[in-house]
Amino acid sequence: MKKILLIVQVFVFSIMIYARPLTNCADTLINKGINNYDTLKVAHLDSLVINDSTKNRVTNVPNIFIPFIELSAKNNYHERIKKNNFSKDDYRNLSDVFTYEPFSFNQDLGSLGQPNEQMFYGLGFGNVSYISDGVLINNRWQNSYNLNRYSNELVDSIEIIPITKGFLYSTYNNPVAVSINSRFNYPMRAITKLRFFQASYDEGFVDVIFHSPITKKLNVGLNISNTAIDSRFANSDYESWKLNAQINYQLSDKMNIDFSYHYSNDTLALFGGLDTNKMLNGNYSTVLYETINKKSARYLLNNNNQANLKILAFVIPNIKSDLSFYFISTSQKYFQNEGQLFENIPRIVHGNYYQTFGMSFRNLYEQKYISFDVIANYETSTFKTDVLNNNSKQDVFTFSGELKYLTNSDRFIPAVYGKLNRFNGKMIYGFGFEVMGKIDNHISYYLGMSLFQQQTTHMENNYLYHSTFPYDLTAVSPPQISENRAAEVGIKFDYNFVSGKITYFNYKSLNKAVPIGFMTKNDSLLVNEVSFFSERNIYNSGINLNFNFVLWKLLFNNNLSYYFSSKTERVYASPDYTLAGKIYYTNFLFENNLYLKTGINYRLTAGQLPFVYDFEKSLQITANLTPMVNYSEVPSSFQLDLFMSGTIQERATIFVTIENVLDAEYYIVPYYFKQPMTLRFGVSWLLYD
């Protein structure tokens, strides 16, 4: 890894030599999902299709393939997060991008590669559907997804679906859905793009994209990336390799065939948090670690394969069609005390496998006054899971639709939608409505409500249920389908120098399956293995203010979320409030050859319930934690970062970040301390071959 980064640094130096003047540069400080206006009045361009400033080359015109049908089509309120909105910002993975989105929070475990839980609306593992190009990419038996495995540089746009409609689009009826759309249009010449960064503890990231037209109708692309970090604490190292391939073929102006393949391989050491000899604050000395447990001897291996064949067609007038065939397989190997070196640590050697074959068909019919969107999904999954001591099969068939009335003025656009889901032999449903529109050219609104049922997953069906509280271990009941109600209302405003959004949501889930830890042996004296599930009711409501302001060459961005429900009502651990913001100075220097952006990033996080994770199953446990540790509420925290980036000729961006400038010692997840003050630098460089 060090040799690779040394070579990359040589490449960075050559950027300064070969840079050429470019008069039209892009400001990418637009807040994700909300339009800002920079007083510099520059155009927003995609760095992969930008024209050469010295010549107007026809070869730079992109190949125009049929675009992917967005889930939020004909939606004038919820905006996509475009890649060029964050490509020059400071991010390691998509969790850093989501930080500035309404009701979003990352349960950060403090080190690169650790399986952080990304939360939306106070919901995380088991409640969020990640949809890539129309296909659910969640682990089918865990019903979760680790964002470290996604290739960030292939993203074209992201849509965070309102909580009222999250159940609608995939094979799982999860309350929250995030749709990630890949890029399809590229310049008609070969391109190479490099992004890398390096930081303390030998943390490094290298990503290379190569894309080339073979003919006017055929494009091929290849992406390879490597991420790694050495152990900051004993047994906390991580390395990941990703390989992605893409083929786009234009059968005609009205029909395309797109094939994509994604592979990832991860090796992750699970160190279990900080032991007492690393803690400087005596308040944490109640965490009892024995000397023999300093190295937990836990690690996780993952291999993931995903292939997707997509046919996009505009053959029938007024109808856009999307037919996808997909295959997903995941191999997870979980090891704990494999060699039985420690008598007081249970030996766990589990191989958990699954594979899924499926198809998805979508028709979007659009006329002048009406839009009708229909989606049908079918998939079959086979499981071989040592952790559940179970080999089984799961079939899912879903049919959903949305009917929307369109008007010329866009002042009032009502819609109704519904879904039927035959999930492994059980029929569940969901339906709702929404109204959106524009009050004038500067203000728009949204209102949505829904009722839907959520499935019981393969994992939940293989655990005992104890529905009473306090838990009666003699009373066992079958898992119940949870009943969910959701509402969301928002106002968006957009003026010359001020823009923002105010959003309120209310969510209720009855009979929700919640994991419980109870009298379970473990490796670190922190209970981190699920014993059974219990039924709980979840009540959550909150308000978000996403506010942006431009003054001279200063840009202000703030994302404030506040939850009205108590910590116990929310059930899952999440902060009472969060504030994430940026203050940047931007300017063009050196005859517009350098675009400078510099300032601060800050995050204020309120306290939350104590909790632990079962990493093998991707479950958060807040109830019945071990009595051997005196758990208290996770305290509030504040982190301040310094950030500076310079974009040269719109071809290369060099960035430097000083993280945790105040060198604050804190944690978000007990007891995974965040990194101390560290320096991180890198470059993103676009080449034309």
Question: Where are these predicted regions, by residue range?
Answer:
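Coil residues (strongly favoring Ser/Thr
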Residues: 27-28, 38-39, 46-47, 52-53, ...
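N-terminal periplasmic "start-of-domain" segments of outer-membrane beta-barrel proteins
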Residues: 31-89
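Extracytoplasmic beta-strand/coil segments of soluble accessory domains associated
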Residues: 57-59, 66-70, 95-136
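Short acidic/polar hinge/loop motifs at secondary-structure boundaries
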Residues: 105, 135-162
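Exposed, low-structure sequence patches enriched in small/polar residues
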Residues: 143, 305-333, 352-689
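A beta-strand signature from Gram-negative outer-membrane beta-barrel systems
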Residues: 149-195, 205
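Transmembrane beta-barrel wall of Gram-negative outer-membrane proteins
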Residues: 204-228, 235-268, 298-315
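Flexible loop and strand-edge segments within Gram-negative outer membrane beta-barrel domains
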Residues: 256-309, 313-314, 329-355, 396, ...
